[in-house]
Every structure is written in structure tokens, then in C-alpha cells.
């Protein structure tokens, strides 16, 4: 094998030596391609696995933790929620519409492959500076393309996209982040797993035909960008949501039978990863007859068939004798379905082309025992330069308030979420635009499931460990503010180039923060994804661990809003304000800096707040609640009253006027009627949570917070109209 071919497959000299040892000979091109894909960062998690192993993954309500297509938790009365978040960053930067669309398609397949009907989607989007003279126009193009791709796929599939977050920062100028989350619901006893066992059991290919799109996608997603990356468009897969809709319905019909042993979607590395993962998890071997693959293009080679990432395809291990019945279901839905192999006990993948053996590879070294790297780490040098920076006000709070409310990181994103169908399936209780977590009704048991997606990249830049822990806490707090109990998380860890020791240090610290927070807050990790190499021309993104928290409220009718719908409601701030301005939005807007050093998270205070919100809502004491986040109580209150029909007369009583922009954790704003105040304050005392009265909601169309005063019309214009103008 010549060195250029090996290099083109991103195989190092050390890895090639391992390949020679595993095979006992030189690989052929097909085998090299397969091993390259399975050992890519995207498929093997070789740089990250050692840090992920310490995550807490168990709890009485966890049915399935990491290692399957998606995580599963018990949501009561025999029902389960199946969910996962993952990235499609690199493809979305190269081809925003197709990249984002297939990102949605991939995560939907991960969920319905487990036997669940998908009932909700969320997304976390990070773009570059839309005001930048050089790249602003391109960033707007990316925003529009990505949003269009997500809405097209989700809407066509009939899956409601009910929430998300969108942030902008120059650190994403060269690498945008597109993280998609999906949640499905099924009976706890009806979950299907990705396994291939039972010697002689048939392996069946179902779904769309295989083309050349997406070739080398897993390897491409395991590398950083440079000038040549513009030619990578052919590696972006093309999605067809209508085919996926048929595939989902066919799979859900199949799941009502007892015809199959296991099922796996063909995602990154296509047929390669699905076959190796199924056999690897089961300790089996497999024979695949590649010439039987349904092909969209003529003249395709075994190499192309094994590595194509054409969308809307699944691999099924059926019970012997049931092949025809499985095929009949997929034919009914107008999809391809062919027996293309069988399970063996050899522990090897045997690849045939017109009955000739063209590839023979041991499965375990590519799946369960793929190489794990221990990359060097070193604390980033910039941390010593930024840690002592202190924020001081340089302009009036009214001026800053206006600048912040109309900033693209805070203002309303109706331009984005209006393109998503959030009400299809008629289960949505609280969707995008209503602040905080999104909520769906589970008709089968009367409960509701709340979900929130969260990542503040600036905080992770300032302190990677505490920043990641804060993402876990913040996502959970948003769920708690709906009245639900946070139960578990899914994570999508977006970082720069792992070959840079400083990036690897950030990653290790981020994992430590997630591990600590999940343990202390009792929200185990049940699924996730790692996206590395988010770097262009040597510049990495800020560390961005996206966290989705999922919780359950036993009675869907008790779901809390985040808006004040009545006058004369008492407005309270819960939790302590500690003056946290490090990495804050007010610092970024006023000083154009991301600096400081974060305070440790007080887990007891965070949990006490969650427990108080849950108990107070169970006792019907609250009218509304919202987590305090970016921009402090100033922005939280502004947004709550912007989406409300009433005005506000509020006083913070802070000694320092800048404290309204403080971003301390473990805080929430609540609204309650005066007759419930005493009972609530007694309860807050019981839980050890400080409650500070800020004022009341009023019938006057006016917003007042300390020295800040605006008419309701001015407030609404700043919040609702700004982004539409900025994105044009």
C-alpha cells in the first residue's frame, strides 16, 4: 500500500502498523477504507473515550444509557422517553441546507430505530459574527440555509420542532455548530436494540438506494477546515424526508411484530459502521454480499458501497425464516428491502462481491476494542491573561439594557422558529418563543415531558470545567421552571482540534464538569455525541458542550408558563446574586471582551431551587417561572414581560446598579398571586432558598426596573423586531 493512499485515509504510521498486526498482512483498498472510517474520531471516539467513561449513567429511572442509538428513561405508567442530541457541524458549514437537513434526519433515525415514535425536536445553533464586514454576509447565508434545512426536514417528517437556542460569536466565523436533538415515546417493554446475533440469521438492508453521496463523510468530520475544504461538497449527504417518513412508518409497523433480533440505522460511515457496530455489540461475525446492495448509480464499487453515507437506510438482523415477512412490510411502504448477508460466529466481517471474498476484517478491533488515544493536555495560556479582568459600568444601565435586549444573542428569534411546525401531532404545550424549556403532553399517561437545550460557549472559554457544569445546571433549571423534575441529560461535546494540547485540556475539563454536575444534581448522562476538529486555519471554536436536560411532570395540566398573564401578581427573585460578570453578556457588549474567572457552582443551592419549584407547583402556588440566565435578571424580566400582556413595576434593591446584569447561577424569577405569598415564603424558607420581592405586574403598558423605564411598545419593539432587521 503506497504512503499517499494511507495518508489520504488519515491513517497514521502507528495506526498502519496496528492494521498490519491485526490483519497479519497488507490491507487492500476496501479494507483500508473501512478501517479508516471505523477508526476515525467520528466513529471511534478515540481521543474522547477515556474522559467519557467516568460519566454517571445509572439511576432507577434509566432504562438504557450510552452505547445504544439513543438513551431511554422511564416516564411513568409503562411509558419511556427515548432521546439523543448530536452534531452535524462540518456538513452544515460546507452545505448549510443539506447538512442541517440530514443532521435532523440522522437524529430522528437514531430515536425511531429504538422503537419510539418521534414526538419532539430541539436544536442548538451557533453562528459567527453577522455584523462582520468580511464574513457577516456569509454568516447570514448560513443562518438562512441551516434554518431552512432543519424546517424542511422536520416539517416534512411531521415532527414538531418545539425549541432551541441560537448564539452568535466571532469564534464561530470559521466553524458553525448545528446540534440537533430528538425525543420519542414508546412503551418501556417495546424498545429495540442494535444487535446482530444468532448464527445464520439474515441481515437485511432496508430503505433508500445507495449512491455516492456522503462518501468519506465520517473521515471529513474528523478533520479541521482549511482553504481546500470548499471542495468537500460531495461529502455532504442529500436527505429526502419523504423517504424517511416512509422508513419510520415501516419500522414502527415492523416493531409490532416479533420478526427481528436487532436494527441499526446507517449513519456516519454508512454500511460499515452499522454492520460493525451490530456485530461488535453482540460478539458475532457477519457476511455481507455487497453486490446485492440496492444501488442508485451504476458502476459502484465495494469501497463506495461500504462507505457511502446515503440517507434513509437501515440494517436489520431478522430471525431466520421471517425474511419474506420483513421484506413485505418495507415493499408495502415502497422501500427497498433485500437480504444481503447473514450472522456468523467467526468474529470477522467477510465482504463478498459476486461471490468473491474481497475483504476480511476482525470486528472487535474496529468496534468494541478500537484504539483509544491518550493525547497530551496543557492549560491554555490565555487563561492567565483573562482571569483578573473585572467588569465595571462605563455607560448608563438604560443604555446597556437597550443594547442588550436588541442584541442577536438575546432578542426574539421568531425569524427562525416561525419556520418550524411546532404544533403538528397536537401534543405541544410550550414551544419556542415562550422562554425556557419546551414541553409536550404524553397522552398515554397524562404526564408532560419538559426539555431544554443549553450551552453558553463564553463561560466555557473562561473556565471549561465550571462552564460545562453550568450548562448542566442551567438546562436542568429551565426544566424545573416548568414544574417538571429533571431526570437525565444528553450531551453534544463540540470542541476544537484534539491534536492541540490546550483544546484537549479544555475537553478533559469540560467532561470533568459534566461528570461532577450530573452526579451532584442526579441527572445521569444517557446518550451523547462528540464533535472535535471544529477548527479553521488553526483557530478553534470556544469549548461548547451542548446539554439537553429532560424531565417529567406527572400531571401535564400543571405545566408552568414563563409569562405574566395577570396584573397584581407578585414578582420574586429566587436565589442569591453573587456578582458573576465573568464571561457575561454585559461584558461582551460593553467591553467587547470574554474574560474573568468563574465562581464554583453551589450544587446544594441549585438542587434546593429545583425542589422548591417542584413542590410549590405541586401545591399550586405559582403562576409562572423562568430561569435567570444570559443578561441577568434585567434580560430575564424584560423577556418575560415582552411575551406577557401586562406591565411591570419592579425594584431590585441592589446596592450596585450593575447587579441587574449579574449572571449568577441557581436563580429564577417567579410570579404568584398575593394570597399564595405567605405559603410560598414559608416553603422557600423550608428549602433554604432566599426569596426577594421585586414588585408587581401592572395593568399599565409600562416596564420599570430600577432606573430603567420603557413603554411596553418600546420593550416589545426592541425584543421582537431587532433580529428580523439584523438578519436581512
From Swiss-Prot:
It is an enzyme of class 6 (ligase). The keyword Cytoplasm applies. It catalyses: N(2)-formyl-N(1)-(5-phospho-beta-D-ribosyl)glycinamide + L-glutamine + ATP + H2O = 2-formamido-N(1)-(5-O-phospho-beta-D-ribosyl)acetamidine + L-glutamate + ADP + phosphate + H(+). Its main location: cytoplasm. It is found in: Cytoplasm. One of its GO terms (biological process) is 'de novo' IMP biosynthetic process. Pathway: Purine metabolism; IMP biosynthesis via de novo pathway; 5-amino-1-(5-phospho-D-ribosyl)imidazole from N(2)-formyl-N(1)-(5-phospho-D-ribosyl)glycinamide: step 1/2. One of its GO terms (cellular component) is cytoplasm. GO terms for molecular function: ATP binding; magnesium ion binding; phosphoribosylformylglycinamidine synthase activity. Mg(2+) 1 binds at residues 86, 529. Mg(2+) 2 binds at residues 110, 265. Its EC number is 6.3.5.3. Monomer. Part of the FGAM synthase complex composed of 1 PurL, 1 PurQ and 2 PurS subunits. NCBIfam families: FGAM_synth_II, PRK01213.1. PANTHER family: PHOSPHORIBOSYLFORMYLGLYCINAMIDINE SYNTHASE SUBUNIT PURL. This is Phosphoribosylformylglycinamidine synthase subunit PurL. It comes from Campylobacter jejuni subsp. jejuni serotype O:2 (strain ATCC 700819 / NCTC 11168). The gene is purL.
Amino acid at each position: 500500500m503506497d504512503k499517499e493512499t494511507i495518508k489520504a485515509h488519515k491513517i497514521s504510521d502507528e495506526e498502519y502498523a496496528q492494521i498490519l498486526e491485526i490483519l497479519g498482512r497488507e490491507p487492500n483498498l476496501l479494507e483500508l477504507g473501512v478501517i479508516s472510517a471505523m477508526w476515525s474520531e467520528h466513529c471511534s471516539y478515540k481521543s474522547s473515550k477515556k474522559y467519557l467513561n467516568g460519566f454517571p449513567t445509572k439511576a432507577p429511572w434509566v432504562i438504557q444509557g450510552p452505547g445504544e442509538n439513543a438513551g431511554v428513561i422511564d416516564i411513568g405508567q409503562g411509558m419511556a422517553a427515548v432521546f439523543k442530541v448530536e452534531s452535524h457541524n462540518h456538513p452544515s458549514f460546507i452545505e448549510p441546507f443539506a447538512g442541517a437537513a440530514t443532521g435532523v434526519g440522522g437524529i430522528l433515525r437514531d430515536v425511531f430505530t429504538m422503537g419510539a415514535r418521534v414526538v419532539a425536536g430541539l436544536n442548538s445553533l451557533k453562528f459567527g459574527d453577522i455584523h462582520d464586514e468580511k464574513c457577516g454576509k456569509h454568516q447570514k447565508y448560513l443562518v438562512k440555509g441551516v434554518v431552512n434545512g432543519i424546517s424542511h426536514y422536520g416539517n416534512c417528517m411531521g415532527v414538531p420542532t418545539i425549541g432551541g437556542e441560537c448564539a452568535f460569536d466571532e469564534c464561530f466565523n470559521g466553524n458553525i455548530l448545528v446540534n440537533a436533538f430528538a425525543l420519542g415515546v414508546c412503551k418501556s417493554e417495546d424498545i429495540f436494540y442494535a444487535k446482530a446475533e444468532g448464527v445464520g440469521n439474515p441481515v437485511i438492508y432496508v430503505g433508500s438506494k445507495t449512491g455516492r453521496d456522503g462518501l468519506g463523510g465520517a473521515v471529513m468530520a474528523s478533520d479541521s477546515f482549511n482553504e481546500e475544504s470548499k471542495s468537500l461538497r460531495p461529502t455532504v449527504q442529500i436527505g429526502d424526508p419523504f423517504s424517511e417518513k416512509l422508513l419510520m412508518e415501516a419500522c414502527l409497523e415492523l416493531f409490532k411484530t416479533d420478526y427481528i433480533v436487532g436494527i441499526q440505522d446507517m449513519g456516519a460511515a454508512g454500511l460499515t459502521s452499522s454492520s460493525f457496530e451490530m456485530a461488535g455489540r453482540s460478539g458475532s461475525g457477519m457476511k455481507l454480499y455487497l453486490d446485492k446492495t440496492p444501488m442508485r448509480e451504476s458502476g459502484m464499487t465495494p469501497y463506495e458501497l461500504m462507505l457511502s453515507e446515503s440517507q434513509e437506510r437501515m440494517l436489520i438482523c431478522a430471525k431466520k425464516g421471517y425474511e419474506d415477512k420483513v421484506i413485505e412490510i418495507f415493499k408495502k411502504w415502497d422501500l427497498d428491502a433485500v437480504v444481503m448477508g447473514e450472522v456468523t460466529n467467526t468474529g470477522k466481517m467477510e465482504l463478498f462481491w459476486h461471490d468473491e471474498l474481497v475483504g476480511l476484517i476482525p470486528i472487535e478491533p474496529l468496534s468494541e476494542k478500537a484504539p483509544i488515544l491518550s493525547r497530551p493536555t496543557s492549560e491554555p495560556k490565555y487563561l492567565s491573561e483573562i482571569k483578573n479582568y473585572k467588569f465595571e459600568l462605563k455607560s448608563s444601565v438604560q443604555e446597556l439594557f437597550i443594547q442588550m435586549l436588541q442584541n442577536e444573542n438575546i432578542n426574539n428569534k421568531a425569524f427562525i422558529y416561525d419556520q418550524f411546525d411546532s404544533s403538528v401531532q397536537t401534543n405541544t404545550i410550550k414551544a419556542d418563543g415562550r422562554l425556557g424549556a419546551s414541553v409536550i403532553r404524553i397522552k398515554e399517561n397524562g404526564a408532560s415531558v419538559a426539555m431544554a437545550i443549553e450551552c453558553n460557549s463564553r463561560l466555557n472559554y473562561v473556565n471549561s470545567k465550571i462552564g460545562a457544569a453550568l450548562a448542566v445546571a442551567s438546562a436542568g433549571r429551565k426544566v424545573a421552571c416548568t414544574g417538571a423534575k429533571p431526570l437525565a441529560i444528553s450531551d453534544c461535546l463540540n470542541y476544537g482540534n484534539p491534536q492541540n494540547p490546550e483544546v484537549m485540556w479544555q475537553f478533559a475539563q469540560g467532561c470533568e464538569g459534566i461528570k461532577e454536575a450530573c452526579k451532584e444534581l442526579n441527572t445521569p448522562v444517557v446518550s451523547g455525541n462528540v464533535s472535535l476538529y471544529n477548527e479553521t486555519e488553526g483557530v478553534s471554536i470556544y469549548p461548547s458542550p451542548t446539554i439537553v436536560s429532560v424531565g417529567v411532570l406527572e400531571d401535564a395540566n400543571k405545566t408552568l408558563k414563563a409569562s405574566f398573564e395577570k396584573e397584581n401578581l407578585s414578582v420574586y427573585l429566587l436565589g442569591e446574586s453573587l456578582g458573576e460578570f465573568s464571561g457575561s453578556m454585559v461584558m461582551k457588549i460593553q467591553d467587547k471582551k470574554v474574560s474573568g474567572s468563574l465562581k464554583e457552582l453551589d450544587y446544594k443551592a441549585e438542587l434546593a431551587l429545583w425542589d422548591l419549584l417542584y413542590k410549590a407547583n405541586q401545591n399550586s402556588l405559582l403562576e409562572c417561572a423562568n430561569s435567570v440566565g444570559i443578561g441577568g435578571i434585567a434580560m430575564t424580566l424584560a423577556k418575560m414581560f415582552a411575551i406577557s400582556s401586562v406591565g411591570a413595576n419592579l425594584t431590585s434593591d441592589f446596592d450596585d446598579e450593575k447587579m441587574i446584569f449579574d449572571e449568577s447561577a441557581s436563580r429564577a424569577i417567579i410570579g404568584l398571586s398575593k394570597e399564595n405569598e405567605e405559603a410560598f415564603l414559608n416553603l422557600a424558607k423550608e428549602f433554604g432558598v432566599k426569596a426577594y420581592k421585586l414588585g408587581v405586574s401592572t395593568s399599565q403598558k409600562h416596564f420599570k426596573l430600577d432606573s430603567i423605564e420603557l413603554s411596553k411598545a418600546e420593550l416589545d419593539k426592541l425584543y421582537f423586531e431587532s433580529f428580523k432587521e439584523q438578519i436581512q
